[in-house]
Every structure is written in structure tokens, then in C-alpha cells.
Amino acid sequence: MDLSIVVPLYNEAESLPELKAWIDASLKDFTYELIFVDDGSTDGSWDVIQGIAGPSVHGIRFRRNYGKSAALYEGFAAAKGDIVVTMDADLQDSPEEIPEMVRMIREEGYDLVSGWKQHRKDNALTKNLPSKLYNWTARKVTGIRLHDMNCGLKAYRQEVVKNIEVYSEMHRYIPYLAKNAGFDKIGEKPVHHQKRKFGVSKFGMNRFVNGFLDLMSLWFLSRFGGKPMHFFGTSGILMFLVGFVMTVWIIAAKLYHQANGLKFRAVTDQPLFYLALLAVVLGVMLFLAGFLGEMVSSSATERNNYQIKERI
């Protein structure tokens, strides 16, 4: 099979029949399967999926809303195509872009091709500006030169999606996850962005803020997640040494003054003593945090455990 088209969705009942027809018209030269992942919709989206289901159209229905990362995780697990394509269900992504993205993977050797919405059909202040700021930061932190890291329209070699774990809100950073897994040939294609035809956008400032927090978390985990002691232990030792050096200096100064008959304030009357004590205590706490992190890391249970109500 050439392609698996994975479409995560939440309350997009009105757009689904038109989206399927658009995909069918755009991919006549390919063999493909269409996988709708209903993330706990309450507007009858599942009924629509059942109505359009067929030999090449499948559906996965969650018992409740878990988020886009969960939907992509289950969609990736179910995908059988040589190339896996993700797109949103709101008709703002154009399936007509998919053949060129597939060509880039097949002929130019890319592991992943991400869409770039150069001319967004969104509110400039509430969505476009935050998106530009977010993507600029993501480029600086990840080192991946993509203009639109969070674009829903992406194409992957199958081995990419089978070797990454998408959890929490990490769907925004799949290119970074892929890069860390060794799939570092990442391309970009400008794509047309359509105005939303049905429903309302799920984007809000809370998602914008969470995106930055997730980026920092991913950066940290990619470097120290497997060995938390490397970070906490090193920080703890450095902090302990700072406190130890300050303590030695205080004691040496006291002994010097006593040996020369000079007055010297009591150790506990000196602010430096309390700074030294604080540094030593923090150092010990950070070191212990490293041990706890190692224990949690070695005994962590599977993160992606979602309750699926139905499959078709």
C-alpha cells in the first residue's frame, strides 16, 4: 500500500464527508487507506465516520478526549502504508499537496516532509503572530530549520512513525522527535492554507503557552531524560562544592583572626555562613533528586494507554 492518511479529529462532523471526497479526488494515482481517529467527539462525528467507512476507510474512537498526540499515536500504530501522511480534519489542509510531498520522500530521500503555511488564513494578532514567535523559538531550540513546525500536514516514511513515541502534547514537535531518533533528513514544502469552513478553531492562548513549556520539556528530556542523574547529580555536586568552599573560607578566616589576636564575628553572625549552608543543602537535595529520577526512569510504565471504544 502506498499511503496511510491519518486524520485526528474532535467535533468535525460537518467537514468529514467533504474531506473524504477531496482526498479521493486528489489521490487517484495511489493506493491508500484513510484512518479517522475520533478524539472523543460529542457532535456526531463518529456517526459520520461510520457512514463513510469502507474497505479503505477506517475509524478509531476514543472513549473520551485525550488530545491530538494520543490520536496521532493510535493512528500511527494502525497505519500500514509505506508513507504515512497526517492532516487536520477542518478542511484547512489541502490533500492536493500530498502527491508532491510523497515525491519528495521517494525521489529526494527525505525521511519527513512538513508543510509550511506561508499565507495563513487566520487572525493575524491572535494566531499568526504567536505562531511566528513560537516557530522562531522552536528553530533556535531544536536546530531544525522549519518555518511551520506545528503544521498538521506532514508526510513520513513509515519507519519514522513506527520509531517515535508521541505523547502528552508532543505532536507539535514530531520533527524534533524524528531527528532525535536518527531521522534527520527533514524537508519542507509551502502549502496552501484554506479558511475554516465549518466549526471553530480549537486554538487558544493556553495552547500557545503550553507549546513553549512543552518545547522546554522536550529539550530537557532529549538530553537528560534517559539519565536524570547526569543533570541533577552534576548540578548537586557543583552546588555542594560551592557551599563547601565558602565554609572552608569562613573557617580559615576565623582561624587566621584567632591566631593573630584579631576580632572576628561569630560564624553564625555572618550572612556568608547561611549562603554556604543553603548551597550545601541544595546540593544534597539535587543529588537525591537525581537518584529519584533514575528510579522513576527505570520503572516508568507505558505512557500511551488510551481507552478505545470502537474500531471500524
Q: Can you say where each PLM-predicted feature lies in the sequence?
A:
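Cell-envelope/extracellular polymer assembly enzymes that use nucleotide-activated donors
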Residues: 2-4, 33
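Short, well-formed alpha-helical segments that are part of the catalytic scaffolds
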Residues: 12-26
